[in-house]
Amino acid sequence: MSDAIKVGFVPLSAAARGILVVFCDDGLKLGPATAKALGGATELVKRAASAAAFKGKSGAALDILAPEGVKATRLIVIGAGKATGLKANDFLKFGGVAAGKLSATAAAMTIMAELPDGAMTSEQAVAIAAGLRLRAYKFDRYKTKKKDGEEGGSRADISLAVGDVAAAKKAFASAGHVVDGVIIARDLVNEPPNVLFPEEFARRASLLRKLGVKVEVLDVKAMDKLGMGALLGVGQGSTRPSRTVIMRWDGGKKGEAPVAFVGKGVCFDTGGISIKPAGSMEDMKGDMGGAACVVGLMHALAARKAKANVVGAIGLVENMPDGNAQRPGDIVTSMSGQTIEIINTDAEGRLVLADVLWYVAKKTKPKFMVDLATLTGAIVVALGTEHAGMFSNNDELADRLLTAGIESGEKVWRLPLGPEYDKLIDSQFADMKNTGGRHGGSITAAQFLQRFVDGTPWAHLDIAGTAMGAPKTDINQSWGSGYGVRLLDRLVADHYERK
């Protein structure tokens, strides 16, 4: 993991280096230290704003050549709107906008972390720093040719000029670990499937041991002994053996029940015998976005030494067509003892989750479980790419996830569960079938999963629209978004860490 930029903090009075970024409100008013740094150039900024019809709208940017007397190569003015009532996500966006103004050859940038009424708080400045790193991320390790101006590979040095350097550094030490977790998740989602198969994914998850995370890897023999027939059935058509990885971070009170996060890790999904169309099948390398999030989250929590007991569990398989592959009509027995008729082998993620959820519920007795999965195309039809679908058997957990989604910017939207949907997954030959047809596809998938939580408070996040291939944003220009790491870190920090 490496960054294209290096972020540091300096006093507001420090001399600018490279590109200078400042903030204004919708009246083009600057902060006192900013106005002092620009000197007589403030009038030139106003004239440039008028010529460009720049109104200081939140997130808008005015890019001009640095005026004479300003020690910078370029001057960028970012609008902060009314500059009151701003949230952490606004500052995250400001950082992304600033990073977007870095050219491939830019060596340095100085950002005046000041609003018209004075210096930003340390938390606001740190949110800008996080936005810078998230926007600057790129996955180009397999490119052998660079575009013009990209040669050299040197990192841009970005300085945030702040009111309290020590406080900003301390706050960023923690927030930076969360950004690292997002980057890890993005890397995993972006990797090609010939590189990131179940065994390799398990190896990378095992690297968390360096941070003090306990990691247990279950191989096929161990899973077979446990009776995980639902998960194993999905992977039996692949030459790559399946794995389940259990990660434990014990940062809370000894003996206290953990909170648990479970990720679907289908490293490549052809659909199996119910094979997918060829168009865009390459995107199915990202069908492990839930597992990627869980690994990134466990990194973030361990690196920042979260004061909570946390379990992360991921089921890793490849869903391939083969003479040994699972067939429509097969009946498998899950770890819970419940039997499942396979109607469509492309409804495989819920089979993986069924066994991992049951394992976690029975073996770790968590306070709650949250699973994440790129589970259904139906959720993308329903919610697009702005929200993940959320289903839950516990209102308190659901409300906390909704709030964490708003605060982190990784939004969720609750959809219903109910016994009236059960008949859609009734089977003539087994306890249930693995798909309920076209109607309410995301709901019936969640209804299926609910049968494997053993009464544990639980939420299911369908992240098919948010984990991969979503439109680019101010803080993400990557195909893999790393969705869920910031959301769940916020959930843990707000409600489940000992004070």
Curated annotation (Swiss-Prot):
Q: Which GO terms describe its biological process?
A: proteolysis
- Cofactor annotation remark: Binds 2 manganese ions per subunit.
- Record's PROSITE patterns? CYTOSOL_AP
- Catalytic center residues: 276, 350
Q: Which Pfam families match?
A: Peptidase_M17, Peptidase_M17_N
EC numbers for this chain: 3.4.11.1, 3.4.11.10
Q: What GO CC terms are in its UniProt record?
A: cytoplasm
The entry's Mn(2+) 2-binding residues are 264, 269, 287, 348
Which one of the record's GO molecular function terms can you name? metalloaminopeptidase activity
Tell whether Flavoprotein is among the UniProt keywords.
Answer: no
Instruction: State its role.
Output: Presumably involved in the processing and regular turnover of intracellular proteins. Catalyzes the removal of unsubstituted N-terminal amino acids from various peptides.
Belongs to which family?
A: Belongs to the peptidase M17 family.
Protein name (Swiss-Prot/TrEMBL)? Probable cytosol aminopeptidase
